[in-house]
């Protein structure tokens, strides 16, 4: 670098950096391209040096000249000439939509073809033809640059950056990961020509995936008809999907409208060197056309070829200018025009004999003249036929080209351009017997041949032309008209068929999309079924885990049985205590009632409310807060119809003394009617303040109290002023079961169910089983706070009694109100409706319902806290009985309705660890009330809780485990709908099928070779599976549902058979060449201790290059079909190597990132390499090219691809 002075950086591309420098020796400007080869091995560096040496020896006016190359600081520097005119890409952008002239396009294209021919003739591939690599000099000469560099950089990451930066020039075989060949350069050449004609890329798409699909389909917008048919036809040939159908660069240069421009850009000596390099016999006889003054084209430049080919030594006749006169030219011209090369020597012999015989005798001359006339006549007939055939062939090619431009691939018939090519190959020189002269020489002299034909008709053939040619002309004209009409009809029918095919193709696309969606949906359903089946079965292959699971199941069953037995024992004990306390309370009430009746009889003149207040227990509270009549309360909950019956049964059990006092009570009621009316009004006003919508019914009840009393008298029952007395006095038998709040009924709600007439049912139990409206749940907790703490001391003895039953967990926070306060706390009101609602569909424990309640509970400030005090003087006894009654209700529901094993199932992820540690907390009395921390911990949405409650397994254990034997949880409905609407059933799960139609053999290789344990695979892919199976991020982990399960028996047998097949028949998967490459790569890996690059990226051996060569006639160098058949094997093998070298997680991350960028229409694909290199790091940066090829090939084979 000391010989050059850096001026500025002018670009960066596949090669690395390009720097403009100035030479200190000659002062000229050069471009130095810096290539980083530090990552290459020594062998690859040697190969790179040889390649650069070959490139430096190429000298051609249309190729950027290499001056020298050297290495410094781990980089390869290539010095080449500087083109001041910029590149063709900038020139196209400078047009700003104005199309180029066809002559300008063809001039540039011919120069590009000449440069590419120079490269291809030396069996070197360019591999990076694009408008940015085609440069313009000051005088407008086109020079091709950067050729061969992609071959040098075959194993570096820069090649991958090239593919990302300029994906518009990729050929279908590259997208399909097939070997690169010379026809891939032809495809890129067609892309450049299309860009010159339209100023746009032939294949454009919003993302890489769609671009690859467009390239594979081979459909491109048609070129403007402003350009000639020859140019459009050439373009369609360059864009053939099959590489063997594309012409070679030599065939392109043989076309007439291309060949006539060669002379403008190459000197005669260069033309001779370039075109004689391949076949010397082609251009040996070509000085003949050079003498014609009318041609003015480059064919006359073949005269200097005498010095190189030495035609005198070959043909025995010196080729000089004076040897060929105008007369001989006239004789030699028509045969090549008539395509009768084999008759040229015969004509020549006939003319020599004619001259000899004319000098000898006139008779012989006349006979020869007659023979010559006959031959000329036949030649003319053949010429006319040839013209007609050529016209028909041209029309046919034009129709094919139109169909090709419209994108219909099925219209083409076999051998599209073979006939034309063959006809031109049949042309040879006048002296040479070779049938391989260039097509361009014949077509260029059509005008000269016609002029000579006219001169011959006027001078030498006037006699026989008038007789014979005149006789054939009318018939010939009629034939032409008929052929033209037939061609027009055929063209119309052809266009009609094309329209029908277009319509049928559109219908076929719709059918295909429907079938593809069905296939994807079927695959998705099958995977879900297999996943559910695998998750639900025991793991046969893993004996230890199976045994542990069985032991855990047995332990859970035993634990549940013991819990159930304990629950039943507790329920029995509590029932016995409840019965005993009920009897004691009943006896106490009986005695109190008798004393009360005696006192009322003795002091009948004393007002009844005062007597009741003296015996009521809590006068101060009754003075402050109004008394709620039990009639009004029971009517509100729908018990007004059954109240009388219940009262009858309770009164019959109370005492026979009650019936004997009925008359006395009736007289007392009549005497105290005025006082009762006054008192009733006060109670009525108090009730209206609390429950506003009951005013009218209360008022009617109080006004019609006398008639109501009569109704009770007619029934033969005890008549008691229930509306005027307190709750404990009027209904002492049921005071043990009364809940301490007013039940407010929604006026618009559905009517309540009628309770059965069972004398053993308590009010508390009925209220607990009743289906309450929302108003009963919306009580304000703060309104009861003082009452709860005020009464807390009254229940301490009861808690002491229950401690021997171990019904209170030590770990529960004492600040939370325990079960003894539930008799007047609104939390019990929350439990009851939830419990009844939960039992409608599926029985569950009370703890689950309490945890779900706060998400739907709202406070209602409309209910004042003055309704709490309905306690009687027998407060402690009533509270004890109510507590026991509630416990009995809960325990009976647990025993009767709950499924064994449902203990703590739905809330196992939400429970406090302290509660889980208690062996009996699962069935505790306090299960209906959780500590405050548990209520704060509930952050899940209601839908998620419902899904968890529905899909919880009965065998689920209490502690949280990472592995679960429960059936799988169904995916969220929303995520399923999204998957159905988008069709992406298998896009995000790496364990699913990668494409719709191809098996993922990488999993098979991974199973046979990597053999990771099931647990390891699960831990590695846990995060990915969680993202798929659990759409709600705040929800609990679904890791137990995504355990990588062992396959069932059928899948194991399939894997075993495929493993045996792979071991016994390795030759079936790869061809011999591929096997040798794999073996050699394995040897290199063993020697170096690292994974060598894939064989397609290793330029060190010729057999390992992912290249092949296609000639014009593919018979001579036909590539083995095994290479195409094993494309899938290449892909899966490449996938396997990448997973082994990088690790599955990193490989999958990079793969998905590249795929996402390719599919994102808004993403700039040029930044893909930077992002991916940051993920890969320096260690795996060289693998980017392989990952890119894999992504592109997967996208190519994923959709419909016929070839």
Curated annotation (Swiss-Prot):
Modified sites of kind Phosphothreonine: 156, 162, 615
InterPro entries with a match to the protein in the record: Kinase-like_dom_sf, NEK_Ser/Thr_kinase_NIMA, Prot_kinase_dom, Protein_kinase_ATP_BS, Ser/Thr_kinase_AS
Transmembrane helix keyword on record: no
Keywords: ATP-binding, Cell cycle, Cell division, Cilium biogenesis/degradation, Cytoplasm, Cytoskeleton, Kinase, Magnesium, Metal-binding, Mitosis, Nucleotide-binding, Nucleus, Phosphoprotein, Serine/threonine-protein kinase, Transferase, Tyrosine-protein kinase
Record-listed Phosphoserine modification sites: 417, 437, 618, 750, 786, 820, 832, 997, 1071
Molecular-function GO term, any one: protein serine kinase activity
Pfam families the record matches: Pkinase (PF00069)
Co-factor requirement: Mg(2+)
EC number(s) stated in the UniProt entry for this protein: 2.7.11.1
Annotated region described as Disordered, given as residue ranges: 329-357, 643-662, 674-708, 814-866, 888-925, 1021-1045, 1063-1120
Protein name: Serine/threonine-protein kinase Nek1
Lineage per the UniProt record: Eukaryota, Metazoa, Chordata, Craniata, Vertebrata
